[in-house]
């Protein structure tokens, strides 16, 4: 029985997948805390779709996929900020326009040059078959993002919580928004290998949303989100070995189950908890 439970750890590809997924899940969850604070969940969705043309172009020209995806994500994020600043359109309309346009462009590129692009890897991810050079790329991305987040997390928090106060103390909202979108784009690129373009949105939203239901303090929220993101990613890869199922699907399903538990039973904001308190107060 013990041998069966430890079997996944005897394979190098499983160890690589579990370690890498844990790191990606943790850093994406850290960013999800800020998305919850600002109400920018849709932007995570936009970036997860917007990197597709960058990946397709990179594959077509035999370039590192991470390079193309990163610049496509940055271009999408800057486009959202620019269109929002010069037009009367609401933010959700701008986000919807950008991500649908970029995703359509990516599908067009794939259809024009289908042999150069592994569509399944883009859409669904392939963490179990990740190449060593991709591991190095993802490791560098995660390391740089983590260092920058640890250096600027307080400044980002102030920008997201109160821009007026941030300007008063000499911070530039535009600079820090660009920094955040750059980090988010980089982490989306890292998560592509784990869960694919479609499910990246869950990695950068669900842990933060779950933690948001459990606490009102940002620092605690971030810690809970990181733990949830890292643990579900590790366990998801582990379970997928026995299920012989899609790794990304298992990871996101676990995160969704934890969200539902928090949604129903959170001590302060849980649906059943609030209903019980309402009945007691009658």
Swiss-Prot record:
Its main location: membrane. The chain crosses the membrane at residues 17-37, 63-83, 93-113, 140-160, 164-184, 186-206, 223-243, 245-265. SUPFAM superfamilies: ABC transporter involved in vitamin B12 uptake, BtuC. It is found in: Cell inner membrane. It comes from the Bacteria. GO terms for biological process: iron ion transport; response to zinc ion; transmembrane transport. It is a multi-pass membrane protein. One of its GO terms (cellular component) is plasma membrane. Keywords: Cell inner membrane, Cell membrane, Ion transport, Iron, Iron transport, Membrane, Transmembrane, Transmembrane helix, Transport. InterPro entries: ABC_BtuC-like (IPR037294), ABC_TroCD (IPR001626). Pfam families: ABC-3. Part of an ATP-driven transport system HI_0359/HI_0360/HI_0361/HI_0362 for iron. Belongs to the ABC-3 integral membrane protein family. This is Probable iron transport system membrane protein HI_0360. It comes from Haemophilus influenzae (strain ATCC 51907 / DSM 11121 / KW20 / Rd). The lineage of its organism: Bacteria, Pseudomonadati, Pseudomonadota, Gammaproteobacteria, Pasteurellales.
């Amino acid at each position: 029985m013990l041998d069966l439970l430890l079997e996944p750890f005897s394979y190098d590809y499983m160890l690589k997948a579990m370690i890498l997924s844990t790191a990606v899940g943790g850093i994406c969850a850290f960013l999800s805390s800020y998305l919850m604070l600002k109400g920018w969940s849709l932007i995570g969705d936009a970036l997860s779709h917007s990197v597709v043309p960058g990946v397709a172009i990179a594959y077509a020209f035999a370039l590192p996929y991470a390079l193309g995806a990163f610049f496509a994500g940055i271009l999408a994020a800057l486009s959202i900020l620019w269109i929002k600043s010069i037009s009367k359109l609401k933010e959700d309309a701008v986000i919807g326009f950008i991500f649908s346009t970029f995703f359509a462009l990516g599908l067009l590129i794939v259809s024009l040059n289908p042999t150069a692009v592994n569509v399944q890897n883009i859409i669904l991810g392939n963490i179990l078959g990740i190449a060593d050079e991709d591991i190095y790329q993802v490791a560098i991305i995660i390391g740089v993002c983590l260092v920058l987040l640890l250096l600027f997390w307080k400044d980002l928090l102030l920008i997201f919580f109160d821009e007026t106060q941030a300007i008063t103390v000499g911070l530039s909202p535009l600079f820090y928004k660009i920094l955040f979108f750059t980090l988010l784009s980089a982490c989306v690129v890292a998560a592509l290998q784990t869960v694919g373009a479609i499910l990246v949105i869950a990695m950068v939203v669900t842990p933060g949303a779950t933690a948001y239901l459990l606490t009102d303090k940002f620092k605690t929220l971030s810690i809970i989100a990181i733990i949830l993101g890292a643990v579900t990613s590790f366990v998801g890869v582990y379970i997928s070995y026995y299920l012989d199922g899609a790794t990304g699907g298992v990871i996101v399903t676990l995160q969704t189950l934890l969200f539902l538990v928090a949604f129903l039973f959170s001590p302060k904001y849980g649906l059943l908890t609030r209903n019980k308190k309402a009945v007691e107060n009658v």
